[in-house]
Every structure is written in C-alpha cells, then in structure tokens.
C-alpha cells in the first residue's frame, strides 16, 4: 500500500518534470527570438517577497498561466484582448468623482426620487394584499380603532357621541392627540384632547380632569387665564377632554417674529396675566403646581389680542401630592428640580422668569442640551447656588465638586469639551440690553423701552430666578412690582358704568384732589396723609362750602380712619399724620355703615396704619417677608390676632416662618403718637420682627384677590384649621390689627365684617376687593355716643362670601376677644332719617387714595350720610367720582384679573 502511494507520487513528479522542461525549452526559444540572452533559458520575474525568482521556483499553476499569456495561441485571442481596451473616455462633468463630490446633493436627490417612485409603485401593486393582511393585525389594537402607538385613528368627518364632528388634527404628544371639532349642540368649534388607550396615560388624564374641574369651579367667571374644560367623556376606550378652542401658542408667536422677540409692553401684559394665574393656582383651596410651564403651553385666546390662557395640566399636581421627580421642560427646569430638592409652587415662578426673558429676547435664557449643560448655563448667568442648598441636595455631585479644604463647591470639569464663562459673568443686564437699546439694540429709542423700563424688568426677573425657592418672589409680590406700575397715559383696565380706568371710582358723588402719593379717601375714609390727601364727604343734601373746604384739607386722627360715616367736621378736628404715604394702600373694601359716630371703631384700628407700614418701604431685597400669619399672631394677648381673618387679602401674604406674637404687644394702642411710631418702623431684613414689614415695589393697581371657595362648606375653617396653611402660600392671609375691643364694639366689628364680606365678590363684576374696614383714630373722648343696636343691622353674611384664602369670614362667635378696643372721638353726622352706603369699584388712577366695594347698597338707620368710598392713586389733580349713590355704580366693570383688558390690546 505504501509502495503504491510512492509509485503514484513518483509518477506525478515525473509529469511535472516533463511540463517544466517543456516550459523551459519554450521559454528559451522565446528569449532567443527576442535576443534577450536570458542565460540557459531561465526567465527572471519580479521579486516575490523581497527576492527574484526563476520560473522553476513558481508553482505549476502560475507557470501555466504565465506561459498561456506570454504566447497567445491565435489571432482571435489578440483581437479579444484589444476589444477590451477602451478607445474613448467618459466626460469629467458626468464622471463619478464629480457626482459624488460637487454634485453630491443632486445625486442623492435623484436616488431618493427613484427610491420613492419604486416604493409608490410597489404599494399600488400590493394595496389589496396589504389591506387584507393588515386587518388581522389592526384588530389587535382596540378592534382596529387604534394604531400601534395606542393613539386613536383620526378620521375627518367622524362624529363622537353624534355631537362632535372631527375637523382636523391640531397636534400630537406623549399623552395622545388634540383635534379640532365642531360641537353641533352649542354651534361652536372646540378642541378635543384624545388620551392614549393606555392605563398610565388614562390615570394621569383623570388627575388632570380633577384639577381642571377644581380650577373651573373656583374660576366660574373665567377671569384667571386657565383653559376652560367644558366636559369629558369616554369614546372607544379613549378618555376625551373637550376644551374651548384657543389660538396659537407663544412659541408660534416668537416664530412669527423670526425669534426677534416681542415688545416690552406686550411682555408686561403676558407677565401680568401669568402672575395672576399663578396667584390663582396658589390659593389654599387649590395649591396646584403646573409643573410644565413653557411657551408651548401658553395659548393666545385670539391671534390679534394679548389675552392668554395656560393649558396642559397633564403633568400638574397639588402641593401635598407630588408624584414625579422628573418634571418641567429642560429649558425651564428650576434648580430645585435639577438638584433633587423637594419642590413646591415656586418652580412655576422660575419657569415664568425664563419665559418672560425668552419672549422679549426671542431666545431661551438657559438652553441646555442636557441637565449638566443646563446647570452650567444657569451658573453662567446667576452665579453659584448657595452652599446651604447644595448641602441638602442629593444630586449635587452630578454638577458640582466639593472642595475639602473649606467645604465650598465648584462646577465639575466638563467632559464633552464645552467651554463656559465664569460663574455670574454672563450678566442678565447685557442679555436684556438694559443700556444698549434692548436685545441686540433692536429697541433703541422705541417708546416704552427706556433704561428705567429695562431696569424694572431686570429686577423682576432676578427676583423670579432666585436659587432659593423660599426667597423667590411670589405671584402676589410680583404683581406689586414697579414693572407693572401703570402710567397716566396707559390704561389696561376696562371699566363699566360708575368706574374709570385711570381715575378713582367715587362712591356717591365725592371728589377730591390728591397728590401723587395721595391718601385721599372719599366719604368717611380718613386720609392717611394730610399733606397730599383729600377727603370728601357728601350727605343726602348738597354739601356746604365749609364742608367741602374742610374735607379738602383734613384727615382723620392718626391716619387710620377706615370705614364709613365720618363727617367733615370730625375730620377737620383731627390731627394730620405728618408722614408721607409713598405707596398706595392695598385694596381695602370699606362698606362703611354704622348708625352713629362710633362706627369708626367697628373693625380694626390699624388697617390703614398697617397698610402704610407695609407699603411705605420700597423693599429691593429678594427676601421681603410677608406679613405674619394667623397661625402665629393669634396667640398674642394684646393684639387680637385671632381676628386677623376678618379681613383676608388686605395688605400682604402670610408667612409661615414668622413669629409675630413677640412683637404685636407694642401695637396694642395705636392712636395718638403710637401710630406714628409704628408707621415709622420698617423691617429691611428677613428676620421675624414683624412689627414692620417691607414690601417690594408696589404697582399702582390693586393686586388680584381670590374668588370665594366653592359652596361646599369646606371653606369654613376655624382658627386651628387656619394654622394648617401650607408653606409658601402666595396669597395674603390677613391684615393684623391691634387694640382692645369692648362688647359693644364686638357687635359692631362683626357687623362691619359681615358687610365687608358681603361685598367681597360680586357676580356682576370682575373687580375683586379684599374686604377690610377700619376705625378712624382721632383725639377726643372715647366714650361718647356708644354703638346703638341698630349697628347690628348688618347681619353676618351667608357662606358664599364667608371665606377667602381658607379663612372664615362668616362667624365671629369662635373668636376670642380678650380686651375692649379703645374708642376715640365719635364722628358726628348731619341729622337725617336714613343713611345709605353706595360703593364704586376700587381702581387706580390719578387722584387720591381710597377704597371701594362693588355693587350693593345698604340702608342703615340713624343720621344720614351717603358714604362713598373710592380709591385712586396717581399724580392727577382730581379723583373721578361716579356712581352717585347708585346700587349698580359699577355693575358692569369686567376687569379681567388685574390691570388687563377684557378685550386686550392688539399685539404689536
């Protein structure tokens, strides 16, 4: 066997030798013919792996191929080889090099056209097959009504509930789709939000429905810029929410400006409406956090108007029911959410600050591509966050490194190569173009864009963009900022009969001349500032010249005369308060209304005094603290703090961190010189010493007050319940008042509180006044003319006006009244058979300062004086007096929120 293999292998080797010798001889002849002299017929070849080889060294197959090509056997092979050589060449313009370089776009366009043409032909050829094959698959998704993304398949012209005819698709999102539809019952177009047919989306949409229904009940008159939910229903396993149809959103508006931004005036109108909406959301009955405030979620009501509404509460929650940690769109995400600190309603204020800058500049203020980039861009503008915030945040190490030596923090080194400016070096001053004519200098010399306007805007934005949510400006304070201060030539209120936009609406034919800081109050509301205030009063008969002269110059007592019924003669006797009133009084609704001169002791001795104290300091610091809360102040023995909730919403916000009881005792007696001392004190810091409270810039407009709670009885809170108010509640809780109260004045106080509350919210007007009434302070014997039982003719109000900010107005029976209030000199009224209180709307303009309550007219017994209470602030020479004792003095004054027209101005 082995021998056979050797024999065979030897035979193969012999054959190879024969071939090799034949190849060598033929090679030698070729070389001889060519005269190459190859030396013994050996042929040299190109180096193989670095050395020259002979033909013998090549494998047999290589030698055969080489021999075949080196000696063509026939002319046919030669011709075939020649045919393969090109005799013409391609034009360079049409060559592949040009097509794939210079003409690359044209090449790909051609490729796309060819591809989609083939795809279309293929789809047309197999359409019937596809329809039949997809039917089974589509039935897997809600019987064919849904696509594979669990969205409802929209068909134009389809009717939901045989009522809503689908018009078109408006938009899509992670939640589902929004379609425009026609409501055949109400004959109007609506927007229907169709939620995905998935359990998580359905659950969140049900929370949205609950929150929207709460807000719509609290905003029955549709004044607080929240989208109106008409109804909701289930349709083929999809929850459908029917909304009013609005226009395009603020991002679309920016895009229409080519991202150059809108004017500062229009930005102000947007800001005012949004602050009012946030103030509404912050009421204790709601405490709703939007959690996704951005330009896309703010829609214009009309494309030619500035009225807006907030939409998309799909991510929203209430303060005590936070369920998400990853919230807010990145550009508008607050530092506490980025850092992982517990958040509250203040995150919406941060978003609002970012939105306002973007609306004016046209570009996002902080446009991070991820959270780390976002934090770096925030630090570029605002500097480093406070150390105490970073110490308590559990995501600090994601953004910052801690220096061991001193415990301070520095930004982490960037891993992606981006370079950032040093902390705080990209100034908001430069971004807004405060001194350079606005962003990019585009607003240079444009009216309403002065350096002063920009400085106010910048100051407001910096307060909104405070790192610490506890010191970030609240909506209530923001609305009182100087940025919203109206000028005499710009009116943004709309008012009906009996009220004007720029002049104070008088109550009953009263008029007064007031200075720019004016404290003039019509009809029984003593001026707090005799140097500039003017008081006018009219009785049932025409006032005499002496009365007019007396009221034009006099003020009542120590300047805290609030309420009705004070006569000109009494005001003439009082000592004027020698302190100026630099800012307008907060909205006070003084219904007036006792039967004799003792009526000035009905409620609070120091309402006007507190108002002056609270508003006389133009606080510029960001941590201006609100007034003390009832939770702390009602324990003071001499302050009667437990009655604070008689006048909710008067002058400020409650502060859950304050301890006011330790300083209230010094204000127990406020008449005479003590009141001057009280007004003279101001607190410029952030301590709990609340005998003096500093406020931010106050706008010359009444801040919006909240609507009454829903009539379900939940609003009647006793004092212990009031102590449970949530922290950072933005709306003012009450105005503290001080002094002692007699048993007779208790009934009078209850009566006046009832009257004030009954005027608090009128359904025929959108002017919302905080109810507060006060007693005039003057020098005299506090024992004359005690309150007659007829003062109790003002019965306690019914529940609809009984509460505000979670504070009971409807009952004084639960309130401890430790000491009697000292009565000052009674106010003598001209004799007559009856007295009527006619009230106008509180408005802001160019007269004195005063207060009005909208709507009702009450008859009381005793001496007659038609008491008109008006409010106007400004620098004009006279306040407008309208109404003339009419029961509908301001029955149709639809002020939309605060200082925003019902029919807003045209966008420019």
Swiss-Prot record:
GO annotation, cellular component aspect: nucleus; terminal bouton
Tissue: In ventral nerve cord and supraesophageal ganglion of embryos. Is most prominent in the mushroom body neuropil and the outer proliferation center of the optic lobes in third instar larvae.
Binding site for ATP: 170-178, 193, 243-246
Region feature Disordered, mapped onto this chain: 1-46, 119-143, 552-592, 623-669, 863-895
Enzyme class: transferase
Domain of life, source organism: Eukaryota
Cellular location(s): Nucleus
Name of the protein in its database record: Serine/threonine-protein kinase minibrain
Source organism per UniProt: Drosophila melanogaster
């Amino acid at each position: 066997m082995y021998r056979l293999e050797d024999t065979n292998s030897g035979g193969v080797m012999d054959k190879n030798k024969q071939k090799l010798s034949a190849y060598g001889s033929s090679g030698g002849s070729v070389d001889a013919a060519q005269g190459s002299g190859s030396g013994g017929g050996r042929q040299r070849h190109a180096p193989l792996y670095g050395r020259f080889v002979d033909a013998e060294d090549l494998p047999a197959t290589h030698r055969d191929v080489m021999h075949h090509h080196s000696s063509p056997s026939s002319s046919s092979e030669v011709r075939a080889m020649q045919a393969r050589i090109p005799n013409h060449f391609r034009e360079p313009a049409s060559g592949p090099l040009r097509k794939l370089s210079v003409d690359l776009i044209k090449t790909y366009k051609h490729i796309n056209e060819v591809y989609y043409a083939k795809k279309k032909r293929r789809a047309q050829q197999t359409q019937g097959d596809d329809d039949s094959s997809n039917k089974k698959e589509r039935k897997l998704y809600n019987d064919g009504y849904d696509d594979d993304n669990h969205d409802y398949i929209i068909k134009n012209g389809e009717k939901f509930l045989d009522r809503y005819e689908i018009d078109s698709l408006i938009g899509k999102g992670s939640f589902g789709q929004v379609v425009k539809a026609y409501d055949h019952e109400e004959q109007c177009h609506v927007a229907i939000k169709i939620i995905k047919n998935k359990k998580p989306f359905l659950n969140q949409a049900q929370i949205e429905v609950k929150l929207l229904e709460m807000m719509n009940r609290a905003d029955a008159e549709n004044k607080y810029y929240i989208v109106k939910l008409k109804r909701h229903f289930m349709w083929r396993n999809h929850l459908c929410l029917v909304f009013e149809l609005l226009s395009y959103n603020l991002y679309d508006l920016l895009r229409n400006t080519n991202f150059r931004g809108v004017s500062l005036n229009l930005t102000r109108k947007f800001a005012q409406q949004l602050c009012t909406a946030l103030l509404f959301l912050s009421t204790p009955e709601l405490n709703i956090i939007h959690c996704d405030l951005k330009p896309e979620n703010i829609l214009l009501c009309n494309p030619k108007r500035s009225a807006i509404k907030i939409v998309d509460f799909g991510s929203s929650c209430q303060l005590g029911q936070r369920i998400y940690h990853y919230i807010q769109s990145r550009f508008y995400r607050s530092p506490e959410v980025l850092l992982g600190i517990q958040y509250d309603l203040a995150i919406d204020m941060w978003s609002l600050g970012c939105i306002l800058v973007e609306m004016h500049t046209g570009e996002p203020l902080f446009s991070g591509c991820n959270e780390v980039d976002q934090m770096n861009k925030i630090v570029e503008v605002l500097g480093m966050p406070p150390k105490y915030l970073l110490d308590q945040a559990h995501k600090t190490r994601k953004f910052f490194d801690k220096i061991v030596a001193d415990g301070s923090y520095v930004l982490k080194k960037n891993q992606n190569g981006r370079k950032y400016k040093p902390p705080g070096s990209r100034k908001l001053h430069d971004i807004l173009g405060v001194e350079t004519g606005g962003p990019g200098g585009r607003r240079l010399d444009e009216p309403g864009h002065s350096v002063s306007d920009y400085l106010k805007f910048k100051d407001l934005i910096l307060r909104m963009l405070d790192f610490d949510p506890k010191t970030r400006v609240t909506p209530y304070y923001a609305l009182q900022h100087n940025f919203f201060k109206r000028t005499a030539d710009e009116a943004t209120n709309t008012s009906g009969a009996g009220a004007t936009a720029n002049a104070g609406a008088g109550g009953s034919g009263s008029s007064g001349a007031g200075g720019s800081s004016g404290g003039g109050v019509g009809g029984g509301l003593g001026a707090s500032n005799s140097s500039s205030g003017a008081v006018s009063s009219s009785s049932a008969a025409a006032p005499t010249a002496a009365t007019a002269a007396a009221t034009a110059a006099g003020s009542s007592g120590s300047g805290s005369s609030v309420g009705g019924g004070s006569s000109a003669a009494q005001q003439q006797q009082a000592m004027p308060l020698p302190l100026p009133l630099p800012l307008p009084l907060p909205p006070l609704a003084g219904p007036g209304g006792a039967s004799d001169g003792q009526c000035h002791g009905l409620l609070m001795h120091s309402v006007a005094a507190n108002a002056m104290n609270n508003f006389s300091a133009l606080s510029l610091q960001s941590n201006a603290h609100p007034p003390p809360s009832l939770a702390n102040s009602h324990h003071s023995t001499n302050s009667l703090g437990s009655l604070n909730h008689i006048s909710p919403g008067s002058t400020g916000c409650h502060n859950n961190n304050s301890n006011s009881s330790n300083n209230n005792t010094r204000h127990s007696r406020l008449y005479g010189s003590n009141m001057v001392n009280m007004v003279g004190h101001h607190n410029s810091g952030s301590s709990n010493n609340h005998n003096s409270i500093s406020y931010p810039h106050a706008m010359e407009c009444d801040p919006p007050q909240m609507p009454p709670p829903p009539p379900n009885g939940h609003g009647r809170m006793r004092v212990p319940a009031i102590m449970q108010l949530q922290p950072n509640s933005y709306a003012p809780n009450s105005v503290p008042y001080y002094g002692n109260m007699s048993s007779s004045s208790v009934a009078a106080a209850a009566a006046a509180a009832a009257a004030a509350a009954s005027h608090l919210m009128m359904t025929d007007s959108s002017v919302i006044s905080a109810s507060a009434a006060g007693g005039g302070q003057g020098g005299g014997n506090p024992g004359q003319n005690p309150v007659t039982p007829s003062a109790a003719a003002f019965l306690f109000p019914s529940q609809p006006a009984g509460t505000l900010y979670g504070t009971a107005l409807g009952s004084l029976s639960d309130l401890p009244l430790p000491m009697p209030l000292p009565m000052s000199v009674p106010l003598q009224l001209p004799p007559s058979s009856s007295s009527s209180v006619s009230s106008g709307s509180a408005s802001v303009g160019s007269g004195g300062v005063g207060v009005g309550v909208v709507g009702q007219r009450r008859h009381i017994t005793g001496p007659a004086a038609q008491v008109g209470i008006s409010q106007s602030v400004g620098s004009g020479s006279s306040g407008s007096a309208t109404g003339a004792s009419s029961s509908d003095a301001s029955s149709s004054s639809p002020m939309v929120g605060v200082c925003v027209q019902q029919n807003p101005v045209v966008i420019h």
